[in-house]
Amino acid sequence: MCYAIPGKIEAIAEKTVVVEYFGEKRKAYNELDDLSVGDYVYAQGGFVIQKIPQDEAESILSVWKETFFDLQEVDLKLSRLDLNQESVSKECLRILDNAAEGRKLSREDILVLIKEKNKSALELLFKVANFLRQKHHKNSCCVHGIIEISNYCCADCAYCGISRSNKNVTRYRMSQKEILEAARQAIEEHGFKTLLLQSGEDSGYSIEELAEIVRQIKANWPALIFISFGEVGLDNLELLYTAGARGLLLRFETSNPKLYKQATGGKDLSSRIAHLKKAYALGYLIITGSLIGLPGQSEEDLLNDIFLAKELHAEMYSFGPFISHPQTPFTGNPSASTETMLKVIALARIIDSAHAKILVTTALETINPDARREALLAGANSVMLNATPLKYRPLYNLYPLRAHEKESIEVQIKDTIGLLMSLGRSPTDLSV
Ligand code: SAM
């Protein structure tokens, strides 16, 4: 199975190319040397990542053609919207009607939605978000792979199971050879077109080593590489970009500077924000968001989190529930509920309808095994599958009982594709 559909180059203007998919045209940034009009390519996240032979492309397209339009039909049916709901308050209906029509909501309106408790109103909120997702992004759903390369961390976050203060963690650091082999398998054998490398803030790798790993992956296999190594330093972001990294996953964790300090052992939020701003200026695709349910977090904070992610030019929003880890200072605090998580996802979709890719996080699936389906029907359109070697997965113990921890990548792919097909989604990155 492949997570991208080949597109045909229709026009080239310097580094910008127009790619055509079954009649739809998208723009992408090209970094390949030998591209001509008429060539077939894979594009991800707005970047051309690989040229493919015409016969190969045409055979993949002929398989996709019917399925592609059939899936769109199913998605369209599932995202129909009916705003005639008697059990929903007039105020809520007014706000949701404005949202569905694409009119900008005031802060007060969004707060009303975030405080809403009525089940029918919430169902309608999720439907509006799903309607907007379909309207702007059609049925595409990104399926990215993640490799967790090390669980060493010099940070001391009060929520995180792999923080430096947790002495009960068995630490691991994958060697360059292991990382390259895991990347090869993910790209070559399992078809991932975008791969995220993640670790704690681990000074055990020099920045040159990390850059070399990115360089080697780029030199050997066609994929878009995202990194998530924490705060690597502003200059090092540039080094990693030059090596070939094109996406940065860095959550700001909370938009509330006081809460951030409490949650991170005294760190300053401004440093994370500076990384995110610099990364955007360098050309990275930004994946960011926050932890929902941190002790002391208010509903206003949640709203500010969504606005901050937007302000930071999130290409993809990543909001996950805080889950209490027994060996951390935040142990015993309750997790955010699925309902709160779905509200945040739906509101992110409403606030940034046309642009946002919204991730269903593993943490959300951990608190609710059906959450992937529920979130995809509440505005989300992106999933990340765990391609870390099985032997290391239990050691990347951010919180207990992580979803999919014991599932092989083959099983994750099969289940994901099954779910996406049942919802009429195509596992593609078309909405570039
Ligand atoms: N070191 C990198 C960083 O700082 O962004 C990436 C690794 S960090 C462990 C990845 C994410 O895990 C964090 O951004 C945080 O939101 C999430 N996380 C850590 N502990 C968690 C917990 N107890 N519950 C839910 N998510 C958690």
Short names for language-model regions:
Residues A4-I5, T16-K27, L35-S36, L61, ...:
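Auxiliary Fe-S-binding modules of radical SAM enzymes
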Residues G45-K51:
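Short, charged beta-turn/beta-strand-edge "cap" motif at the junction between a beta-strand
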Residues F126-S165, R171-Q198:
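N-terminal pre-triad scaffold of radical SAM enzymes
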Residues L195, G200-G204, H275-E300, F319-A336, ...:
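Conserved strand-turn element in the central/C-terminal portion of the radical SAM core barrel
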Residues D39-Y40:
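Structural motif
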Residues R164-L180, A186-E208, I213-L276, L285-I292, ...:
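Core AdoMet radical
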Residues K8-A13, L32-D34:
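A residue-level detector for short acidic-glycine micro-motifs
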Residues G233-L240, P295-L308, T366-L377:
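Catalytic cores of alpha/beta
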